[in-house]
Every structure is written in C-alpha cells, then in structure tokens.
C-alpha cells in the first residue's frame, strides 16, 4: 500500500517560483491547491486531473476548507475510467457526509454504467442495472415492469420495437413507479423518460467509425435520468414519480428497419423513417406517450439525441428545450444551485412543422431546408407530449460523455445533470 499524498487548500498564492498562474504547488508535506476565489470548484477539479496525471493514486484531503462540494469537485476530476484511486476524505458533518456518500454511490454508478462496453451492457442489462440501483435507493417504495421483444410489438410500442428488432438482443421498456406513500391512487407528480440506445451503429444510415466509436454512450440519457431519480430519493423525494427507459440496440441486419418504413404510434401519429440514425426520437416517442397518459405536472426526457446540440454547445453544456418559460427558469435555477452546466436552445411552434413527409404525418428527420437539427428533434418529440406547452422539458444531454480527456475531465462519462434534475424534483 502506497503512502497517501496530502492535498491541502490555501487562499494564499503559490510561491513566485511556481509562476503567477500556478494553481498548485508541491512541498515536503504534499500538494497545496491555491484558491483565488474565482471558480474554486473548477480549480480544484482541474488540479485533481493534473494530480492524477502525475500517477498519484492515493491521496488524503487534509487540513481545513474541505466541504462537500470541494471534496466532490476533487473526485470529479480525479476519477478516471482506468485503474484504481483511493481518497482519505476530510471530516464532514453528518449531512455533508451523507450527501457525499450519495454522490459517490449514484453519480459514480452513472459514470461507470455509461463507460461500460456495449458487449457487456445490452438493453436488458441496462434496465436491470437501473432496477438494482433504484431498489437500493427506494426499497419497497417502488415497483416495476419490464416489457421486451415481441411483447412490445403486441402492446403497440412500435417505435421501440422497430428500432430494436434488428439486433439479436431484444429491445426493452422499463416502466418503474416510485410511490413513497404506497397509495395506488396517489397522483403522479413527474414522469421521467430516458433514451437507452445501448449501441448505435446508425442502422442502414450507417455511421463512420469516427462517429460510431463512442456509441456505447448513446444510453447516457437513460443512465443520467435513472441516477437523477435515485439521487432525488436519497434527498428525501416524497412525491410519486414514474420512470420510463426505452432501451434498444440500433443495428444492421436482415430484420433491421429501413428508409421509407412508416411507424404507426398508439397516439395516432404516423412517422416516415428517412434516417435510421435518427432513432433516439423514435424510441422516446413511446415513452412520452406513456408519460403523457399519467397526466403528471412535469415530464422530463433526457437523451443523447443530436450531433447538432454538440455542434452548438460542445461537450460543455446540456441543451435544454421547452415551451414553458417558467419551467425553464426553475431548471436553470436548479442547475445554478448544483453548479452544473445547462444552456437553453430555441424551440418554437414552427419547429414542429419542419418535419415534412410525402407519405406520413411526420418525417423522423428534417429536410436540408431546415438545418436546426436539435430544435427540430425537440419539435418532433413534442408531437408525442399531450400538453407540450406546459410542464415538459427535453434535455439533449451533450455533456454526458467525452471521447478524450480535457483539463477538467478524464475521457468517458461525466455524470453531469444528475444533481440538477434531482434538485428540480425535490424543490418545493
């Protein structure tokens, strides 16, 4: 066992020999991080990334100043997808310790689940992992149903079945009910819907390798929103919430769906498929139909839905779309409280009509005349939300995963978004 490296905090600048912009310095007692009052959490996270890069895999957070958020910021930057790391944590009060332990259990679960190879994490495995996490968080206050394969077709979950039928691993719908009072007549406060594409080849609209190599992470929306529900429960969520995970592989085979196919949904909408790589919206539609049927106050869907959102925001922000300005303000307030990055992008009534088809009511992708791809994708989803003007949030989660490490994050999943959605669910 290696001896732990002490990591301490200071509000004094580093010795001039380290340079005027030095954020950390090394001394006989260990490593000191020099906080300057400007984005201290970001400074700690970036310093932790550098410390990990030095090959230091065992540290102690020593001295004063280590609260819950600073401790978590260090771990967010220190954690990576390879190897093991050990932290001796600073002493926190009971509430702070409980919060840190919840983050370690749940947000690490989200990061590790998204990072898992697709070979190990198919649709059924993803649904079962979600059930296991929520059982741990909620105990007997939850119930669930898993529907898969041909049962989906028989029950008219045609979007999910159509996308997933081309894989040897059957598509799966997880419907989970968190009901803390146990009253079967209790109203549903919120419905959460997650895109769980466990690997996305693009189907017959095949991706290039450079765009396919990270597609094990295309279930990032499902993992993140599952983590958000679990985290809200650990923070005392006392309202009924239902979760729908739409899980499938998007593969090429003799049974895979094709361009020109028409999907007929339970709500009466018909959709022509003109791009099999725009599959996420097709599976989410089924979950949104179920969510709308519950008449909740709030519907939130999360999906790694479009490259257009990444073009606009990079991997630095989650993109928020909604017609509900008050709800957008609440979400942004939750994001600010949790120090997580969200950015609102446009969604207007005209985006709903930018999906023309010659053979169906809707096309699953906009034509070249309508290049706002993230907004038209949100417009598509709105056709499956009964009251889309109020109480609906669509999150195109661009900040879920990074193909390469940066100064603040290792390569792989970030876990961003879990705390914001949990905050929104538990806010009074």
From Swiss-Prot:
Record flagged with keyword Metal-binding: yes
Coiled coil start-end: none
EC number: 3.4.11.23
Subcellular location: Cytoplasm
GO biological-process terms attached to the record: proteolysis
Note describing how the cofactor binds: Binds 2 manganese ions per subunit.
Positions that bind Mn(2+) 1: 200, 277, 279
GO cellular component: cytoplasm
UniProt-recorded Gene Ontology molecular function terms: manganese ion binding; metalloaminopeptidase activity
Catalytic activity as recorded in UniProt: Release of an N-terminal amino acid, Xaa, from a peptide or arylamide. Xaa is preferably Glu or Asp but may be other amino acids, including Leu, Met, His, Cys and Gln
Principal location: cytoplasm
InterPro entries: Leucine_aapep/pepB, M17_PepB-like_N, Pept_M17_PepB, Peptidase_M17_C
Role summary: Probably plays an important role in intracellular peptide degradation.
Protein name: Peptidase B
Source species taxonomy: Bacteria, Pseudomonadati, Pseudomonadota, Gammaproteobacteria, Enterobacterales
Gene for this chain: pepB
